[in-house]
């Protein structure tokens, strides 16, 4: 292009030399000026259009994660600002190109997502149809209650709803329908069952930055459990999970002499956002069950069986010991139903104080009538004339007898503790490893029984020797 312009300039200059007239000279000069002006404007335009361009295309930038549309939009705004046209209009062209631009990975991802949605919808539909099927013989009667078989929409919905709700009852109900085994036969059976909580009644746990977690045992807890164990089947029902409360329960009764069974939060019924200790799950007659707890939610299903107590904060008190006379009276009177007696107290939280007040009145009446030869109180308590001419109040006689039995029982427990300690020392070395199991070196059940009997004889012999040594030491 430049060479053409140069040649044209040279030709014009030659023409000017050939024609010497002034008019022709002026015309040629004007033509040269116009030609130079157009040439300079062409050079300026070429300089503007000849800006440096990147070797990275829009596709390469898009794959790398660069937002090409924003960049292009910025350029469009700049161009529109310069030209003064289409300043506020969106770049529909760039949006369309963005929608169309998809990599192979995006196509695969969209394909898999569609298949996942189809599979999920099919699975949910199939599950719903399966759960709405007719009842099967092995399903529980409680689940099938008031819902018949059939494939009408209403019946299918009811069966689906019943089966769907039953899946959540697994987490709301206790692990077993009967939390306790059947009671022993009458000669060995305690007349009443006493369910007591652990936290803030027998023990109190608190945390401090200096000492961490510490657990305090309430004054009189050992006496409370030991004394009432001769009258009641004691069930320790903790409000905490087993992993936290099991060790504390073992410390309270290491040889299981006082507490018959331990239950924990896992055995509660979860209802309305709270854990409830449902006494109907204990496999016991509710007319013979008493629960002592500090949380009203724990006994909200059977409040008539409850003795509410204030939570213990760790300070020394005698409320456990003061509760014993009433519980002893209740167990020794051959009560058919404990609920009317419990509900006869206006304020159950102060039951011990109110019972002491009643006993005091009855005792004054008894001694007043005894002076005049009356014996109505003994008859009212079911003792008749079995106490002969004793002037002691019947409840005092019952307490004295219970105290004697308690001392004898505790003496036997101390001996049993020593025997259990010796047994644990002797049985500690009797273990079998995984290697013995793999190699088949385990003894047969008959051989294991013989080994245990021999060990038990050794334990009994060592225990008798320990008793003889103690007697000799005491005699000296």
Curated annotation (Swiss-Prot):
Query: Which InterPro entries does this one have?
Result: FCP1_dom, HAD-like_sf, HAD_sf, TIM50
A Gene Ontology molecular-function term?
mitochondrion targeting sequence binding
What does it do? Answer: Essential component of the TIM23 complex, a complex that mediates the translocation of transit peptide-containing proteins across the mitochondrial inner membrane. Required to direct preproteins in transit and direct them to the channel protein TIM23, and possibly facilitates transfer of the translocating proteins from the TOM complex to the TIM23 complex. Does not act as a structural subunit of the TIM23 complex but plays a dynamic role in protein import. Has no phosphatase activity.
**Residue ranges of the TM segments:** 115-131
Q: Where is this region: Disordered?
A: 67-105
What is the name of the gene encoding this protein? TIM50
Q: Which Pfam families match?
A: NIF
Source organism of this protein record: Saccharomyces cerevisiae (strain ATCC 204508 / S288c) (Baker's yeast)
State the Gene Ontology BP annotations.
Answer: intracellular protein transport; protein import into mitochondrial matrix; protein insertion into mitochondrial inner membrane; regulation of mitochondrial membrane permeability
Q: How does it sit in the membrane?
A: Single-pass membrane protein
* Subcellular location(s) per record: Mitochondrion inner membrane
User: Known SMART domains for this protein?
Assistant: CPDc
Q: Which residues lie on this side of the membrane: Mitochondrial intermembrane?
A: 132-476
- The molecule here is called Mitochondrial import inner membrane translocase subunit TIM50
Q: Other remarks on record?
A: Present with 2400 molecules/cell in log phase SD medium.
List the biased-composition ranges (Basic and acidic residues): 67-95
* Recorded superkingdom: Eukaryota
**What does UniProt say about this protein's domains?**
The mitochondrial intermembrane region is required for generation but not stabilization of the TIM23 complex. The FCP1 homology domain does not contain the canonical D-x-D-x-[TV] active site, suggesting that it probably does not display phosphatase activity.
**Predominant cellular place of this UniProt entry's protein:** mitochondrion
Please give the PROSITE patterns that the UniProt record associates with this protein: FCP1
What's a single GO CC term here? TIM23 mitochondrial import inner membrane translocase complex
Q: How does it assemble?
A: Component of the TIM23 complex, at least composed of TIM23, TIM17, TIM50 and TIM21. Interacts directly with TIM23. Interacts with preproteins in transit.
